[in-house]
UniProtKB/Swiss-Prot annotation:
InterPro entries given in the database record: Ribosomal_bS18 (IPR001648), Ribosomal_bS18_sf (IPR036870)
Protein name: Small ribosomal subunit protein bS18c
HAMAP family referenced in this protein's UniProt entry, alphabetically: Ribosomal_bS18
Source organism: Ostreococcus tauri
Family per similarity comment: Belongs to the bacterial ribosomal protein bS18 family.
Amino acid sequence: MNFTRQRTSPIHAGEIISYKNVDLLRRFITEQGKILPRRLTGVTAKEQRQLAKAIKQARILGFLQFLYKE
């Protein structure tokens, strides 16, 4: 018998994916400012699209930086 483990989403049920929720968005960005792929984060395809859209919107509005320099 094969047992597959059901993945749990790193985004909890109460959390809203929004450009204003900067703390949530920072969890899905690398130190260089790149958006992490879903195979590393474990989010669903729908959540990944929402995250990418929210991160890009937050960058344009100035909530997040485009590049993180040392």
